[in-house]
Amino acid sequence: MSKSLRVGVVGAGAMGADHIDRINNRTSGAHISAIIEPDAARAAAAAEDAPGAQAFTRIEDAIAADAVDAVLIAVPGQFHEPVLVPALEAGLPILCEKPLTPDSESSLRIVELEQKLDKPHIQVGFMRRFDPEYNNLRKLVESGEAGELLMLRGLHRNPSVGESYTQSMLITDSVVHEFDVIPWLAGSRVVSVEVKYPKTSSLAHSGLKEPILVIMELENGVLVDVEMNVNIQFGYQVATEAVFEKGLARIGQPSGMQRWRDGEFLINEHTDFTTRFATAYDRQIQSWVDAVHEGTLVAGPNAWDGYLVALSCEAGVKALDGGVIPVDAAPRPDFYA
């Protein structure tokens, strides 16, 4: 494919609008050809950054009009399956924001439907795999330079969350990212999940018990703990420490200007994910567009990865009530090898 890839974005909320801007202004080889959004006001606002894009209220209408070569799904997770199905049936390449679907049962349906095609068509938007620091850490793991990987420690901290943020969202909206990137870093899937509760923050709203410590065991024996804290106040921080046989490595440390003033040491920290993972988002989209042009269609997490994450999230939600919860998964199909 030598022409510019015509991308239809499904969903014109904050994430969809961000992707529209990214594709039209920072991505080569693609442009927004269609905005699929039932809310007229949102669609009109998004269209300001996508001159010439056609407006549709349903993905089926955009497909019937031959308005798209590929689809980017940016609606909430509960609406993913109704968009994925017609897009797959039309044989379109898809980048689907996380999660693939909200549960393993529906994710498995998508996996089974996709296997009727000649190759994987779905890339799931777990953007951390495209972060330069995560890539450097994975290369270190794979090289064996520091010996075997023994343990991973993760920090996932948000300044605050709204009243609508529920207990289960600690897993399904936040730790969901660790359930993808940790197996990718360590080269082994999650086989069990446990949740521990430290002292509850007085800043957590009524009904929310946090922070939590999520403990994962991987199939290769690596143990992982992740601090999930959504009311840390000072900023947004995602960091990982890897413990090897011959040393350790850390990523996600504060960066930028360092200042010493009035007996204090000051350094900048991110305030949200849009700056912490700005490069990752850009690389994710560009890699996907390049893969579609090359005919490989997928350049990152695939639908099977999305299914495994759904299984891990279900175990994590159960673990909020106590116990070590197993994550049982069938072997990866050759289709996704």
Swiss-Prot record:
**Biological processes per GO annotation:** inositol catabolic process
The reaction(s) catalysed by this protein are: myo-inositol + NAD(+) = scyllo-inosose + NADH + H(+)
> A single Pfam family, by name?
GFO_IDH_MocA_C3
GO molecular function (one): inositol 2-dehydrogenase (NAD+) activity
InterPro entries under this entry?
Answer: Gfo-Idh-MocA_inositol_DH, Gfo/Idh/MocA-like_OxRdtase_N, GFO_IDH_MocA-like_dom, MI/DCI_dehydrogenase, NAD(P)-bd_dom_sf
Report keywords, A-Z. Answer: NAD, Oxidoreductase
Sorted alphabetically, which Gene3D superfamilies does this protein's record hold?
Dihydrodipicolinate Reductase, domain 2, NAD(P)-binding Rossmann-like Domain
Q: Quick one: signal sequence residues? A: none
Family from the record? Belongs to the Gfo/Idh/MocA family.
Report quaternary structure and partners: Homotetramer.
What is the documented function of this protein? Involved in the oxidation of myo-inositol (MI) to 2-keto-myo-inositol (2KMI or 2-inosose).
What name goes with this protein? Inositol 2-dehydrogenase
Q: What organism does this protein naturally occur in?
A: Corynebacterium glutamicum (strain ATCC 13032 / DSM 20300 / JCM 1318 / BCRC 11384 / CCUG 27702 / LMG 3730 / NBRC 12168 / NCIMB 10025 / NRRL B-2784 / 534)
The root-end lineage is:
Bacteria, Bacillati, Actinomycetota, Actinomycetes, Mycobacteriales
Report which gene this protein is encoded by. Answer: iolG
